Structures are given as structure tokens and as C-alpha cells.
Amino acid sequence: FERAGETETIRYPLRQRAPGSAARRGFGPRDVILNLMPDRYADGDPANDSLPGYTDRADRAEPGGRHGGDLAGLSERLDYIAGMGYTMVWPTPLMENNQPTHSYHGYAVTDLYRVDPRFGSNDDYRRFVAAARARGVGVIQDIVPNHIGSAHPWMQDLPTPDWINNRGVFQPTRHARNALSDPYAAAVDREDFTRGWFVASMPDLNQRNPYVANFLIQH
């Protein structure tokens, strides 16, 4: 680029990818993606449906309860998924959701580093990804940087008072999603959708806090 009559050249090398590196091409328009909810898909290990220390127990008679699907069930059906022509499988979040109710969907995370034991273990997830890859199927990891679960340990002692939007007090959004893309939307609607919580069980992370932003980037 040029600046005040000066020219500066910045050089950087394009190196050969290291064997076995994790830097791979992502998904795109060429892919056929299967989006599924693991708890509702297939139960390959009934022994982990309900576990000590996890208050939301399996109950197939309850529409909002857990139904027992897990990584073992997903792994058992990879041949079927590949045979249907899918090139990518996108499970909803698999991280721990130790919420009192409605933990099946995975979007109220209480441990950002641990697969929910009712789905399996971190090692089970690695094996699932490897098994999918062996069949030519990629795995999209669903992560949730917008919010956490209300039972997350942070909610017992927030790192900073403004770690959560509205200082940890539930403030629902009106879900005016188009306010973010509508050039004529009212500022109050943009603010409401940006800072409001989806539901009381999903405290909204304040990404304007530089420590929150740094945590999300690094982790």
C-alpha cells in the first residue's frame, strides 16, 4: 500500500500444510448438510440417558425432556447418513447443558469444554468425527458465543458485573431480527435484539466487554 509517497511491501510465506494439520477447507454451497438434534436422533447407549448429578433426566413422554440420543447412536448411523448422500453432518451443540429442564437442544451450555456425558465423552466426539471423515462426511461443530446456560458457574459469581447483558438480570428480546440488517430500523430495536436475552435460561453474553470478547476469541 502507499502512504505519503512511500511504498511498503509486506511479505508472508505460503507454506505447505503440515501433515495431519487441522487446517482444512470448510463447508460451502457444494455440500449437502444434515442438521440434526443428537438427543432426538438415535440412542446407541441407553446407560447414559440419565446420570447422577444431572437434573434433567430422560423422559420420552415429555416433549421438552431428554429422549436419550447420543454420539453412540450417531456413530452407528454414519453409513446410513453417508449413503443418503450427505457430505456434512451438523449436530446441534454437544457441550454440557446441566440445566433443570429443556437441556435436550444443547444451546444452554454449562461447560464450554466438555461434551455432555449424556451424549458421551470428548473422546467419543473425536472418534465420531474420525469415523465420519473416514466415510467422506465432514462434521460441523455448533458453538454458541451469544449466550450460556443459566446454570453455568459464571452465574454464581460473574467475573465482572457486566459480563452478562443487563448485568445478569433477565431482559427478554422482542426478536426483531431484521433490525440488524434493516437500514431504517429504529436504534431501540437494534439495541433490544443485540442486548436482550432469548429466554431466561440463556443469559446473554456482553461481547462489548473486552474480557468477554477476548475469552471467546481465545477459547
What is the role of each PLM region?
Residues 4, 15-19, 39-44, 210:
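Generic structural motif
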Residues 11-15, 35, 206:
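Generic structural detector for well-ordered beta-strands
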Residues 22-49:
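Compositionally biased low-complexity segments at domain edges in trafficked proteins
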Residues 1-10, 40-41, 81, 217:
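Extracytoplasmic/cell-surface-exposed regions of Actinobacterial cell-envelope-associated
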Residues 1-27:
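Extended acidic/polar, glycine-enriched regions
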Residues 42-219:
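Substrate-binding/active-site clefts of carbohydrate-active enzymes
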